[in-house]
Amino acid sequence: MANIKSAIKRVEITERNRLHNKSYKSAVKTLTKKYFDAVAAYSASPSNDALQAAQTSLSAAFSKIDKAVKRGVIHRNNGARKKARLARALNRHLANAAS
């Protein structure tokens, strides 16, 4: 453990920030899983309700990813990659349904 006062403060701040970042990352993962579940439900039985649910969960996931990027929890390229992956999942099923 640190002996110097400023070092002790830095340890406390680092721990606080780590927990804050962890909550954002966890929320992003949770919303991503919910979105993929909604896409799977839509692909199993395509309907307007299932599509609406998938789009709603996509919007929530995008919002949380953008907030995490804005607060510096994840890098902007990482956020862009996550968002592209989410959008691609639904677009694949929409393309299959259209053809």
Curated annotation (Swiss-Prot):
The keyword rRNA-binding applies. It holds the Pfam family Ribosomal_S20p. One of its GO terms (molecular function) is structural constituent of ribosome. The keyword rRNA-binding applies. Belongs to the bacterial ribosomal protein bS20 family. NCBIfam families: S20. This is Small ribosomal subunit protein bS20.
